[in-house]
Amino acid sequence: MWRHGLRVTEAVSMRRDQINLQRARAWIQRLKNSLSVEQPIDGEELRAIKSYLNTRDDKLPWLFVSERGLPMTRQAVNYLIDEAGKRASLEVHPHMLRHSCGYYLANEGTDLRTMQDYMGHRDPKHTVRYSRVAGRRFEGLWKK
């Protein structure tokens, strides 16, 4: 969820056919009238997805399934993230992963248009919020 800036519903709605393991690409079907986009899958992430799919002996279309073979639910994701937060003594919620992706991209100096496309925002005003707090954007400003 973090690496692709996914909303919980976008993550639990993903299907196997949205992942192209040979090309290391994921089709991200955005919600809320956002723009869908194909994104690269990085090495570590690609290995984790392959490993996860190799443990499954089903032909279910969903990428993420419960132990009962049903699609993962929003509630299950909320629970898992809440429990992980408790173990780390942090108060977290799933949408923080999406926001963290935006802040990370901004701090890495990603241009606003690329961030907008990556996050699936139709309106740049939703993307600007991430760059506004990116302190690194001022580094080297006067070194020319």
Predicted regions and their residues:
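Short, basic (Lys/Arg/His-rich) helix/loop patches that form interaction surfaces
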Residues: 39, 78-117
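DNA/chromatin major-groove-contacting recognition/catalytic segments
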Residues: 37-40, 132-144
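Mobile genetic element proteins and their domesticated derivatives, centered on retroelements
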Residues: 28, 81, 127-130
